[in-house]
Amino acid sequence: KKAIEDGSYGPSFSKFKEALKYGNDFSIITARGQSPKALKDGTKVLIDMTFSDEEKQMMLDRLRGSSIDEYLSLQDYHPVSSDEFKEKFGAEGGAENPEIAKTIALKDFTSRVVDAAKELEGNPEFNGLSVGFSDDDLKNVELAKEFIGKELKNSYPNVRFLVYDTSDPKDTKKKRIVIQKS
């Protein structure tokens, strides 16, 4: 709450808020060790404190009958240093190797949204699927680019992947890498 009250947002805040307003699926993948519930609860606080009434209504309209709480419960929260992450995915990665753990979480999220999008393929309004990943650590950005290019693009050739380097919060747009089929 203090960061919100101080207006101290992360470099991807506007993109995250946009995803929330449109009711897009998302995953919070962080090296931190708090519980997934803490991330979910924090997201709810963020909505409550930063969304105008109009933005909340737009979000509810996009959720087609689901409540904000139901929507948030369907999303992925992967603090890769948490006990919950280790229980779900095993010892690989975690606090000892958060870069690898983040790729495991990204693969899990991508698999979930690709499976969910299969229901939309016949819908004329469906324009395809994009998955975005942002990080403020250049090592994680490079590893994500490599992982997407070598593994995820082979498994999901029709998905458009975007990687955002947020190491310089003033220059996130210029550091957007698009990885799609050639």
Residue spans for each PLM region:
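C-terminal accessory extensions appended to soluble enzyme cores
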Residues: 143, 157-182
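Acidic, divalent-metal-coordinating active-site segment for phosphoryl/phosphodiester hydrolysis
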Residues: 135-149
